[in-house]
Design a protein with these regions (language model features):
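Extended interfacial segments that mediate partner engagement and assembly in macromolecular machines
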Residues: 63-73, 80-202
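Internal alpha/beta scaffold segment
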Residues: 170-214, 234-261
C-alpha cells in the first residue's frame, strides 16, 4: 500500500523581501528560501507551497493581504498567465536595480575575481514596443485561465494564436494584444486569426501533428519594412489552395508588408532553419540600419531583437575594444557578422567565426553590401575551428570580441584564447552566470577592467553584460 503524501504547508502573512532569478521573488522562512512568481518586494501574502526541495521551496500566492508600495500596475491583460513580461508589476527603475545587483552578485559569487566598480546599467529608452521580432504558435488547444475554467463557460472554438504556456507545450494562450512590438503586428496576427476562423481553417495539433495553420513569425526593422512568415502543415487535398488564399488575404490587407513568405513544415518542431521558405510577395529580406551600415535580415537570420539597445550594446563593445585601425580582431560567435562589420572600419582585419553556415553567408553579404573588404568569416563548431593552427594561419588577434550563447564558452575555446594571449578581450554575454565562470578561467592571465550591464529586455529578468579584460603585466 502506497504512503499518502503529506500535504504541503500554507504560509500565512509572509512579506516578500527580494527579487530572484527567472522573474520570481523570494522570502526566507526559517532556513528555507521560498521562490514566488508575480510578487514584488514588500507584498504581504499567504503562500501555498507547491514544490519542496532540500534547500528551497516553490510557492504561489493564494491571497494578497497588502500590496507593496513599489508595486506597479501591469499594463498587459495577459500578465500573470503569459510567461513573457514577468516584471510588469515592478517599476522599471526597480527592474534596473535588480539587474544591476544580479550582475554584481553573479560575477562576485561565481567568478570570484577582482572586479572594478560596475558601471550603472544602461536602461532601454523604450520599455514597450521595443522588439523587432515575435513568433506566435497556432494551436487547436487554447489555454484556459483559472477564471475561465471556474466560469464553466464552454468554448465552441478552442483554436488560438499566441504564446506557448510553460509546462504545457501543446497549449496556446491566445493573445489579443502584445505590447512588445509595434501595434501593427497585433493587427496582422488578429487578421490572420479572424480569417482562419471565418474560413474554418484547421489549427495545428502538437500531439497528433496535424492541422493546417501552424506558426507565424513577424519581423520589422528601423527602415520601416515588415516581414511575415506563415508556417503551414499540409495534411489533405486542398490545403495548399487554402494556405495560398490566406496568404493573398494578408497581402491584400497589409500592403506595408515588404517580405511575405510561407513554409510547408512537415517536421515535428517549428524551426525553419532547414526548411524551404517560399516568397509569396515582395522580397526575401528586410534591412536594418546602424550608423552608416545596412544589415540584410532574411527569414532565417539572427539579429538582436531590440534594435535600439543593440546599437548601444555594440557601441560599448567597440569602445571597450579601443581600436586604432591597426588591430587584428577576432569576433567569436559572430552570428550574421553584425559586431564584426560594426567594428571593421576601426580595425585592420576582422576574423569572424560562427557555428551556423547560413549566418556566415549573411555575414559575408553584409560585408559586401557595405563595401567592407577587411573581414573574413568561417563556419563550424567554435572548439573545432578556433585552434592554435587556425590562429597561425589567419593572424594573431590583438583583440578578441566574444559573444557566446547562454552556455558560455567551451573550456577548449578558453584554452586557445589563453594561448593566443590577445591584449584585450571584450566579453559580451546574455548570461552573467556563465560569463562569471569563464572570467574565473581567464583570471590567471587577465584582469577585469570594465563592466557594463545593458538592459535589452525591459519587464523581463534577462540582462546583457559587457566585460573588458586586459592581459596582466607580470613582473620578473
Amino acid at each position: 500500500m502506497s504512503r499518502k503524501k503529506k500535504p504541503l504547508p500554507l504560509l500565512e502573512n509572509i512579506t516578500i523581501t527580494d527579487v530572484a532569478a527567472e522573474g520570481k521573488s523570494l522570502v526566507r522562512v526559517g532556513d528555507m528560501v521560498v521562490f514566488v512568481p508575480f510578487c514584488v518586494p514588500g507584498d504581504v501574502v499567504d503562500l501555498q507551497i507547491k514544490k519542496k526541495k532540500h534547500s528551497y521551496c516553490e510557492a504561489e500566492v493564494v491571497r494578497f493581504i497588502e500590496y507593496s508600495k513599489v508595486r506597479a500596475t501591469p499594463f498587459c491583460e495577459h500578465f500573470g498567465v503569459c510567461g513573457g513580461c514577468k516584471w510588469q508589476n515592478l517599476p522599471y527603475e526597480e527592474q534596473l536595480k535588480a539587474k544591476q545587483k544580479q550582475v554584481y552578485d553573479q560575477l562576485r559569487r561565481i567568478g570570484k575575481v577582482e572586479l572594478p566598480e560596475i558601471s550603472p546599467i544602461m536602461g532601454s529608452e523604450k520599455t514597450r514596443e521595443y522588439r523587432n521580432k515575435l513568433e506566435f504558435g497556432c494551436c487547436n488547444k487554447r489555454w484556459l485561465t483559472r477564471e475561465q475554467v471556474a466560469s464553466g463557460f464552454k468554448y465552441d472554438n478552442m483554436n488560438g494564436i499566441g504564446f506557448h504556456i510553460t509546462g504545457a507545450f501543446d497549449k496556446i494562450l491566445p493573445i489579443e494584444k502584445c505590447w512588445l512590438m509595434d501595434d501593427m503586428h497585433n493587427r496582422i496576427r488578429n487578421s490572420i486569426r479572424d480569417y482562419a476562423f471565418e474560413h474554418s481553417l484547421t489549427f495545428f495539433d502538437l500531439r497528433e501533428q496535424h492541422g493546417l495553420l501552424r506558426d507565424i513569425i513577424i519581423r520589422n526593422s528601423n527602415s520601416g519594412e515588415w516581414m511575415v512568415i506563415v508556417q503551414f502543415h499540409y495534411d489533405e487535398e486542398g490545403d495548399e489552395q487554402r494556405a495560398l488564399a490566406l496568404m493573398q488575404h494578408i497581402a491584400d490587407s497589409f500592403p506595408e508588408i515588404t517580405a511575405l513568405m510561407y513554409v510547408n513544415n512537415q517536421k515535428c518542431n517549428d524551426t525553419i532553419g532547414d526548411q524551404d521558405v517560399i516568397v509569396f510577395k515582395g522580397n526575401d529580406h528586410i534591412y536594418e540600419h546602424m550608423e552608416e551600415l545596412r544589415f540584410k535580415v532574411g527569414p532565417k537570420s539572427f539579429y538582436q531583437t531590440n534594435t535600439e539597445q543593440a546599437y548601444h550594446l555594440y557601441c560599448v563593445a567597440r569602445d571597450f575594444a579601443q581600436l586604432t585601425g591597426n588591430e587584428t580582431v577576432y569576433d567569436l560567435y559572430t552570428g550574421t557578422g553584425t559586431i564584426a562589420n560594426f567594428v571593421a572600419r576601426k580595425a585592420s582585419k576582422v576574423v569572424g567565426i560562427e557555428y551556423v553556415p547560413e549566418a556566415i553567408e549573411d555575414a559575408k553579404v553584409n560585408s559586401e553590401i557595405n563595401g567592407i573588404d577587411n573581414t573574413s568569416f568561417f563556419a563550424g563548431d567554435m572548439k573545432d575551428i578556433l585552434t592554435d593552427e587556425f590562429i597561425a594561419e589567419h593572424g594573431h588577434p590583438d583583440v578578441i570580441i566574444t559573444d557566446p550563447p547562454r552556455a558560455g564558452m567551451h573550456p577548449d575555446v578558453v584554452k586557445v584564447i589563453m594561448n593566443a594571449a590577445p591584449k584585450r578581450i571584450v566579453y559580451v554575454s546574455c548570461n552573467p552566470a556563465t560569463q562569471a565562470r569563464d572570467l574565473q578561467l581567464l583570471d590567471p592571465l587577465y584582469k577585469v577592467e570594465k563592466v557594463q550591464p545593458v538592459d535589452m529586455f525591459p519587464h523581463t529578468p534577462h540582462v546583457e553584460n559587457v566585460v573588458l579584460l586586459r592581459i596582466k603585466e607580470f613582473k620578473n
